[in-house]
């Protein structure tokens, strides 16, 4: 599971600015998808080979927070689920009573806490940090989040407190088969669906806590295929599941999505598509995971209601045209068995392997059917393509002036590859690389022989 970093502090100390610094590497990934709603309260990031997840507790609790509700339920939940807490204070304003109150609360949590003094640009950092030593969290770390100064050093300090990336990845990799995360807002029927699936199985392992945060990895087998179900709802007995008391955890959901091969998004057909559903789907798309959308509680809807839901899916989720959509009833089991065939198809598409030769031929056929546009009178040239990764499939295309290729042509290429590779249920990502111009930055200097020849030609021209 990805390590979780919680940003804690009173309002206006720079939590959101630091959040943007720590997650900016992912901002551009979904910018081209119309209709996609993103939530800026939590998100994944990476520094070098160190992946992590950031939770902005200020955003979770509301920016108009007061000292009384600063440690409200959602903020406390984020702290409970975090591996490291970054306690932000304002170096310009100095130590306040609110800072001291937050420090007292954090000391009772038993969490790894780094004290971060923000807004140290333009002030004496040593002097600004001196009074914060009294909070008892060790040496403060100075940063200027607005300019990004000190952020890399801060993340190195965070990294030193956490297990190595290989250990984090090994925890998920030790679970067999296709890992499936069932996500959805409370009361959408996720728990009923999970219990329906497990109730049908004859080979079900004991529920084993996957992490200290109680996400559950449940191995089981169906039709000879091994699966591991990632349940984000915590440790619970199957006989005691009550959806009404199910708690929605953003952190557990994000971790489950990251650990999964395929995500099954459960929607409530009777309530339609909510803003929270769109946020979750945006996170899945951001992570590049294969996706099956299960529209639950389909039984009991009349034909007009079903048509309305289908129209709403097309209208509100145009960016999920690649995803498999299944209509089910978790309570009665209708359509549940068919989910696994679609999960397997999505998994196979996400982990497809394609040769460079085949991808280059597909690129050439795409250009024959619809050649790249002219840019400033010159045509963009695309030379060859190769695979750059799996889950999601990444296709790297090399050429000239690729950075000037319009988004419409990139979408055309994406659809062309998807259609000819028969990819179902997985997003596809294209990366464009422009070859270096060997003459860039060089002056066109004549050789001595060329200079002599030029002089002769000029003398000859003057005689005429």
From Swiss-Prot:
GO terms for molecular function: ATP hydrolysis activity; GTP binding; ribosome binding. One of its GO terms (biological process) is ribosome biogenesis. Residues 3-166, 178-351 form the EngA-type G domain. PROSITE patterns: G_ENGA (PS51712). GTP 1 binds at residues 9-16, 56-60, 118-121. Residues 352-436 form the KH-like domain. GTP 2 binds at residues 184-191, 231-235, 296-299. Transmembrane segments: none annotated. The keyword Repeat applies. InterPro entries: AAA+_ATPase, G_ENGA, GTP-bd, GTPase_Der, KH_dom-like, KH_dom-like_a/b, P-loop_NTPase, Small_GTP-bd. Keywords: GTP-binding, Nucleotide-binding, Repeat, Ribosome biogenesis. Associates with the 50S ribosomal subunit. GTPase that plays an essential role in the late steps of ribosome biogenesis. HAMAP family: GTPase_Der. Belongs to the TRAFAC class TrmE-Era-EngA-EngB-Septin-like GTPase superfamily. EngA (Der) GTPase family. This is GTPase Der. It comes from Thioalkalivibrio sulfidiphilus (strain HL-EbGR7).
């Amino acid at each position: 599971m990805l390590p979780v970093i919680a940003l804690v502090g009173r309002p206006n100390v720079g939590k959101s600015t630091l959040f943007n610094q720590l997650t900016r590497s992912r901002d551009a990934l979904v910018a081209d998808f119309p209709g996609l709603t993103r939530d800026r309260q939590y998100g994944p990031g990476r520094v070098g080979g160190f992946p992590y997840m950031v939770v902005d507790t200020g955003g979770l609790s509301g920016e108009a927070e007061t000292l009384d509700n600063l440690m409200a339920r959602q903020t406390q939940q984020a702290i409970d689920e975090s591996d490291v807490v970054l306690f932000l204070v304002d170096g310009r304003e100095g130590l306040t009573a609110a800072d001291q109150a937050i420090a007292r609360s954090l000391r009772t949590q038993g969490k790894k806490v780094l004290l971060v003094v923000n807004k140290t640009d333009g002030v004496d950092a040593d002097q600004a940090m001196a009074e914060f030593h009294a909070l008892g969290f060790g040496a403060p770390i100075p940063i200027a989040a607005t300019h990004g100064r000190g952020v890399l050093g801060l993340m190195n300090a965070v990294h030193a407190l956490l297990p190595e990336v290989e250990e984090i990845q090994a925890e998920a990799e030790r679970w067999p088969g296709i890992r499936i995360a069932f996500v959805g807002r409370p009361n959408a029927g996720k728990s009923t669906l999970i219990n329906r699936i497990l109730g049908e199985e004859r080979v079900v392992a004991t529920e084993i806590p996957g992490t200290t945060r109680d996400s559950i990895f449940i191995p089981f087998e169906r039709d000879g295929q091994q699966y591991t179900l990632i349940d984000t709802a915590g440790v619970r007995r199957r006989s005691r599941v009550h959806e009404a008391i199910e708690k929605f955890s953003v952190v557990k959901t994000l971790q489950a999505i990251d650990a999964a091969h395929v995500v099954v998004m459960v929607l409530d057909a009777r309530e339609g598509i909510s803003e929270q559903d769109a946020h979750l789907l945006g996170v899945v798309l951001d992570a590049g995971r294969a996706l099956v959308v299960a529209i639950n509680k389909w039984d009991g809807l009349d034909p007009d209601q079903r048509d309305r839901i289908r129209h709403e899916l097309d209208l509100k989720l145009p960016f999920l045209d690649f995803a498999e959509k299944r209509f089910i009833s978790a309570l009665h089991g209708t359509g549940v068995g068919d989910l696994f065939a679609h999960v397997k198809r999505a998994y196979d598409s996400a982990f497809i392997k394609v040769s460079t030769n085949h991808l280059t031929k597909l690129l050439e056929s795409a250009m024959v059917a619809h050649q790249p546009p002219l840019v400033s009178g010159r045509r963009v040239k695309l030379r060859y393509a190769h695979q750059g990764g799996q889950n999601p499939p990444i296709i790297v295309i090399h050429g000239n002036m690729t950075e000037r290729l319009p988004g419409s042509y990139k979408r055309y290429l994406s659809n062309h590859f998807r259609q000819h590779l028969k990819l179902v249920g997985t997003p596809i990502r294209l990366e464009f690389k422009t070859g270096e111009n060997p003459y860039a930055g060089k002056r066109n200097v004549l050789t001595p022989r060329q200079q002599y020849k030029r002089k002769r030609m000029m003398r000859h021209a003057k005689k005429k």
